[in-house]
From Swiss-Prot:
EC id: 3.1.1.-
Compartments in which it is found: Secreted
Top-level lineage group: Eukaryota
Listed GO CC annotations: extracellular region
First and last residue of the signal peptide: 1-23
GO BP annotations, alphabetical order: lipid catabolic process
Protein name as annotated: GDSL esterase/lipase At2g04570
GO molecular function (one): fatty acyl-[ACP] hydrolase activity
Family: Belongs to the 'GDSL' lipolytic enzyme family.
Record: active site: S35 (nucleophile), D325, H328
Pfam families to which the protein is assigned, alphabetical: Lipase_GDSL
Length: 350
């Protein structure tokens, strides 16, 4: 029995760490969401929720800070590369790119946003409805660039990824009294799931067919939450993790039901919780040495402008860390998570 368990572990690690390829199956990846998938849109709007400065991007191509909340690539960049597309997915608002670049992939995501408009209002970032408006604009540009028929085909054949929701709880519901005075946690989850449902329906109405709706990670294990979990020795905040599991279950059921209602749709719920929790519970198996603190600065509270260049506490090798800043994973973690989610999700679309 022990040998079988060891064999399973080896096979699992190979699947998680190897580079997955699905080349030639998808013409483009279209992305909506928050900082987990923002490649720099916030650089071009008036908000403090930015990361277009060092040490962010220090392990990116050319050591360039792009606005990704990471030391390097984010998960969607690795997914694009695995599909045989470009090695990164550019931000829609970045003027250094144009429709020829966006034709194979684009992200409308905005760091610090959420399903709830009240969440995006906190730091004046792009709400989900505005991301959808930009997508409509993108469709017009794409059809002008590729021609109406080919543009329509690209829209219908592209893969749509949605990664959002953590900020609704950690930066809104539990941070300010507004929503928590209006809703219980369960009712707020239902409120957000309803917004997610309507967003997917609107995407489908605009021609999207292959849609992956992402769930929440174990958000109680982020370094920031561990650091504020006084009296536990820096353990994960169990309540936040429980909320993530509950919300993921509601999204999963919603997607299953909605997929039967929308004609020609291929909807999949992509759950990052378990693969991320496996990293957190057994970091050494993935080559990590530090899981409870981040690489940047003290590793407990800093993100964004708190992660300043030349901070003497910032680590020298981010690959040893699960988290880059107090809220976001390192490039290495993003790569592992991208492979895990591609293995579980992409076969449904190919």
């Amino acid at each position: 029995m022990g040998h079988l368990k060891s064999l399973f572990t080896i096979l699992f690690l190979i699947a998680m760490s190897s580079t997955v390829t699905f080349a030639g199956k998808i013409p483009a990846i279209i992305v909506f969401g928050d900082s987990s998938v923002d490649a720099g849109n916030n650089n071009y709007i008036p908000t403090v929720a930015r990361s277009n400065f060092e040490p962010y991007g220090r392990d990116f191509v050319g050591g360039k800070p792009t606005g990704r909340f990471c030391n390097g690539k984010i998960a969607t960049d690795f997914m694009s590369e695995a599909l045989g597309l470009k090695p990164i997915i550019p931000a829609y608002l970045d003027p250094s790119y144009n429709i020829s670049d966006f034709a194979t992939g684009v992200t409308f995501a905005s760091a610090a946003t959420g399903y709830d408009n009240a969440t995006s209002d906190v730091l004046s970032v792009l709400p989900l409805w505005k991301q959808l408006e930009y997508y409509k604009e993108y469709q017009t540009k794409l059809k002008a660039y590729q021609g109406k028929d080919r543009g329509t085909e690209t829209i219908e054949s592209s893969l749509y990824l949605i990664s959002i929701g953590t900020n609704d709880f950690l930066e809104n519901y539990f941070a300010f009294p507004g929503r928590s005075s209006q809703y219980s946690v369960s009712l707020y989850q239902d409120f957000l799931a309803g917004i997610a449902k309507e967003f997917v329906k609107k995407l489908h109405g605009l021609g999207a067919r292959k849609i992956s709706l992402g769930g929440l990670p174990p958000m109680g294990c982020m370094p920031l939450e561990r650091a504020t979990n006084i009296g536990t020795g820096g353990e994960c905040v169990g309540r936040y993790n429980d909320i993530a599991v509950q919300f993921n279950s509601k999204l999963d059921k919603m997607v299953e039901k909605l997929s039967k209602e929308l004609p020609g749709s291929n909807l999949v719920f992509s759950n990052p919780y378990e693969p991320f929790m496996r990293i957190i519970k057994n970091p050494s198996s993935f080559g990590f040495e530090v899981v409870g603190a981040a690489c940047c600065a003290t590793g407990m509270f800093e993100m964004g402008y708190g992660c300043q260049r030349n901070n003497p506490f910032t680590c020298t090798n981010a690959d040893k860390y699960v988290f880059w800043d107090s809220f976001h994973p390192t490039q290495k973690t993003n790569h592992i998570m991208a492979n895990a989610l591609m293995n579980s999700t992409f076969p449904h679309f190919l």
